[in-house]
Regions:
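Positively charged n-region of N-terminal signal peptides that target proteins for export
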Residues: 1-8
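Predominantly soluble domains enriched in secretory-pathway, periplasmic, or organellar proteins
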Residues: 18-378
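Bacterial N-terminal signal peptides
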Residues: 8-20
Length: 378
């Protein structure tokens, strides 16, 4: 029997290519309307880019790493930042006097001209607000408007009822109403990760294929789940993530690595060991040999958080190290892969050494960060 994979806890981080060692630059959203630019070498904010359309809720890098796309909350805005000049080159809002949109994520096409997302339209009537169905949406950045919408198959009258609903909010390109998007290297197909992987035609969202993701060579499993974002690995179109599953008898949970090829549409699973209560997404070093995740066990005063280092060449857990838990937090990695970051919600980024897992510094940003993700560039 095949056991389907459910994508959850989608978080947005840029998929990094190979980068040289040395300090990089971080971009993150902050209240009330900023994108902060942080120099890794100095450990401080070196620039603040004001968003004209409101509070940043998601942030994503283009395929060529030259442009950053930001979605904002106040009026369902979209802003485009040029990385070199750190200037906003384009901004607009989708809302008007009688229509509002719940905009979830935004995955750019390879040319950086379109954003693929899911939206829900809220129409103001004379005596009520009418909430429409969740729709696949193409946003034309040059024309500053929605170019095409298509009803999502299986969507109910509200966004929450969409088939394969994934993590809420901005990070991964889909969010509530359908899970995260990945765009194929040639820009012709979209991959939507939910209870199945749905392959869509990027031009009209017609379904090309539905991939039922089964655990190979392990027939006695249930509740197979893919956690966190899909990180880039060495070859174009290759992605890797954490997965977990449980056996159907005593329900012991196991985690491991899942690799997905966007070109061949094939998955490969490698179990590693017993799964903790919760895990963040996997972050990969520039040489693609090591990956890091954060595990959480317990609750309240008994909560325990650990960094886990994974050798991607052997798919083995090689190192662990405990750090002080936060009630809410996100996890990131530096441009050279030598530092690990614990950040949000709050004003500070805690910096840890990726080899020893020892705390090295606390960066005070002077602004409360949003949960929209972190873009890391060399």
């Amino acid at each position: 029997m095949k056991h389907l994979i459910a994508l959850r806890h989608l978080i947005i981080l840029s998929c990094l290519g190979a980068v040289s060692a040395g300090a990089g630059t971080l971009f993150c959203g902050a209240y009330p309307y900023w994108v902060l630019v942080i120099d890794e070498g100095q450990g401080k904010v070196t620039d603040r880019i004001r968003m004209e359309t409101g509070l940043p809720t998601s942030i994503r890098i283009s395929h060529d790493h030259k442009t950053i796309f930001v979605t904002t909350n106040d009026r369902s805005g979209i802003e485009v930042i040029d990385v070199a000049t750190r200037k906003v080159t384009n901004h607009f809002v989708l809302n008007d006097a009688t229509h509002k949109f719940r905009l979830n994520g935004g995955a750019p096409d390879p040319d950086g001209k379109l954003l693929y997302a899911t939206t829900t339209q809220i129409t103001k009537q004379a005596d009520r607000y009418e909430i429409g169905k969740a729709k696949y949406t193409i946003i034309d950045l040059a024309q500053q408007k929605i170019g095409k919408t298509v009803d999502m198959p299986g969507a109910n009258d509200t966004a929450g009822g969409a088939e394969g609903g994934g993590a809420a909010g901005g990070g991964g390109g889909g969010g509530r109403g359908g899970g995260g998007f990945e765009v194929s290297p040639d820009g012709k197909f979209l991959y939507q990760f939910g209870s199945t992987v749905t392959v869509l035609n990027a031009a009209d969202f017609s379904v090309v294929e539905r991939i039922q993701l089964a655990q190979p060579d392990a027939p006695a499993v249930e509740n197979l789940g893919l956690g966190g974002l899909l990180e880039a690995v060495s070859d174009p179109g290759q992605r890797v993530s954490i997965f977990n599953y449980s056996d159907p008898i005593v329900h012991n949970r196991v985690f491991g690595l899942a690799r997905f090829d966007l070109n061949t549409r094939k998955f490969d699973f490698t179990p590693i060991g017993p799964a903790p209560v919760a895990m963040t997404g996997l972050h990969v070093t520039p040489d693609k040999k090591s990956g890091y995740t954060v595990s959480t066990n317990g609750t309240g005063g008994n909560k325990r958080c650990e960094f886990w280092g994974i050798d991607l060449t052997t798919s083995r857990l090689t190192r662990t190290g405990e750090f002080p838990c936060r009630t809410r937090y996100s996890f990131g990695i530096s441009a050279d892969g030598k530092k690990l970051y614990i950040y949000g919600a709050g004003y500070e980024i805690e910096v840890y050494d990726a080899v020893t897992f020892k705390h090295e510094a606390t960066w005070d940003l002077g602004n409360d960060m949003t949960g929209g993700g972190l873009v890391v560039l060399p």
